């Protein structure tokens, strides 16, 4: 452009490949000049050199896993990316470090340089990893127990043992559950809503009875 003159540009051109790269030749397509501080009639796109650089698109990743008592956040627990294009998908390898081991959403992560994007239906080279957070969900507890026949379907907390706790952690539990029959035999604990878990050597907020066996 001459001096400080400027023009507007509208329309769409095309490049031979959608992938990241520098100085890709642009076919003009419907690209057209329009007046700004200069007159479009004084210029032409024909015969010029037209290039486009395609840069990596930054992605924010969310990982998700159950509580396991550690701050390790593996790329294999990927839940979602925020900005994949055209229905593409990617995976991740490696691991980072969560700021907390406890249950929460959107926990910040460090050591993200140890995480790597991996090709899926899209190319990892077209993207860069901008930030990563992890959602740590409650660990599902299982329960079992035994009691002596007492003609009712109640199962007291003292009759019930909790399992699937993280190694070295314990919880207190209280209340009453319900079993399928008052008679002697093996039954599923059908209703645990009356059982409450509480902190001991572990945090009750990191666990749930819902969905367990």
Predicted feature descriptions by range:
Residues 1-213:
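Short loop/turn motifs that initiate or flank beta-strands
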């Amino acid at each position: 452009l001459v001096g400080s003159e400027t023009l507007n540009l509208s329309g769409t051109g095309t490049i031979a490949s959608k992938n990241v790269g520098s100085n890709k030749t642009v076919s003009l397509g419907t690209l057209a000049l329009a007046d700004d501080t200069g007159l479009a009639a004084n210029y032409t796109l024909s015969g010029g050199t037209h290039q486009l650089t395609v840069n990596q698109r930054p992605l924010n990743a969310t990982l998700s896993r159950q509580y396991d008592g550690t701050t390790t956040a593996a790329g294999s627990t990927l839940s979602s990316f925020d900005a994949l294009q055209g229905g593409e998908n990617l995976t991740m390898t490696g691991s980072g470090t969560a700021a907390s081991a406890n249950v929460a959403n959107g926990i910040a992560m460090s050591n993200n340089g140890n995480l790597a994007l991996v090709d899926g239906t899209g190319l990892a080279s077209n993207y860069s990893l901008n930030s990563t957070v992890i959602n740590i969900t409650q660990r599902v507890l299982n329960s079992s127990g035994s009691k002596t026949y007492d003609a009712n379907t109640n199962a007291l907390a003292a009759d019930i043992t909790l399992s699937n706790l993280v190694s070295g952690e314990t919880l207190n539990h209280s209340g009453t559950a319900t079993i399928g029959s008052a008679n002697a035999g093996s039954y599923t604990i059908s209703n645990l809503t009356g059982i409450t878990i509480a902190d001991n050597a572990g945090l009750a907020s990191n666990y749930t009875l819902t969905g367990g066996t």
